[in-house]
Design a protein with these regions (language model features):
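Amphipathic terminal alpha-helices
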Residues: 154-169
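A conserved pocket-lining segment of Rossmann-fold NAD(P)-dependent short-chain dehydrogenase/reductase
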Residues: 43-65, 69
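Conserved C-terminal active-site "lid" loop/helix of NAD(P)H-dependent oxidoreductases
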Residues: 67, 74, 97-101, 121-150
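Residue-level signal for the nucleotide or nucleotide-sugar donor/cofactor binding architecture
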Residues: 6, 62-65, 94, 151-154
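Mid/C-terminal beta-alpha module of Rossmann-like enzyme folds, strongest
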Residues: 71-74, 79-127, 167-169
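Conserved active-site helix of classical SDR/Rossmann-fold NAD(P)-dependent CH-OH oxidoreductases
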Residues: 5-17, 71-72
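Conserved beta-loop-beta element that borders a ligand/cofactor-binding pocket
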Residues: 12-34
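Glycine-rich "substrate-gating" loop/helix at the edge of Rossmann-like oxidoreductase active sites
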Residues: 1-4, 29-37, 57-65
Length: 169
């Protein structure tokens, strides 16, 4: 995963430093909203059956973005964004140990089981373990300031609740 991040950073830097274009890169948080992976039937079912564990201490920080906010930010960036790298995320980064149990509770499910990192590496691989235990959140301050963008769904808590209210089980 680290090599992939290095490659992404390299491409972002090359793009934003290109002399003949006003290159910009948008870094999106974890998408959520109707029809997204997080709220797809199989994922919700797995959460309800406690098949999505809390890995290690759940110390990974996640930033989320509602798909409607991502679309709005993209349109604004294309229309008036200057060169640079912009994080398109909500206002409330969250630790996995915070958002995963909260989502389970919103579904009326029991809290996720805890699984040690070593076991999760064997069962799910290093990538998932890193996401759940080491990921770092992004800040949307630059996107708000330079693009004039404001997420309509500023909190994942409220956004998750809204999506679940309109979703049919």
């Amino acid at each position: 995963m680290r090599r992939a991040l290095e490659a992404i950073r390299y491409l972002e830097n090359r793009l934003t430093a290109a002399p003949d274009i006003a290159g910009l890169a948008l870094r999106y948080g974890a998408f959520y909203g109707p029809g997204t992976g997080l709220f797809a039937g199989p994922v919700i079912d797995r959460l309800r059956r406690r098949r999505v564990p809390l890995i290690g201490g759940g110390n990974g920080w996640w930033s989320f973005v509602h798909v409607d906010d991502a679309a709005a930010a993209t349109a604004i960036a294309v229309e008036r964004g200057g060169p640079g790298i912009y994080n398109i995320v909500d206002d409330e980064p969250a630790l996995v140990r915070e958002w995963l149990p909260a989502l389970a509770a919103m579904l009326g499910a029991k809290p996720p089981r805890h699984v040690p990192k070593w076991l999760a590496r064997i069962a799910a691989g290093e990538h998932l373990v890193t996401l759940m235990t080491e990921a770092r959140a992004g800040s949307n301050v630059k996107a708000k300031r330079r693009l004039g963008w404001q997420p309509e769904h500023a909190s994942w808590r409220r956004g998750f609740t809204e999506v679940l209210e309109v979703r049919t089980p």
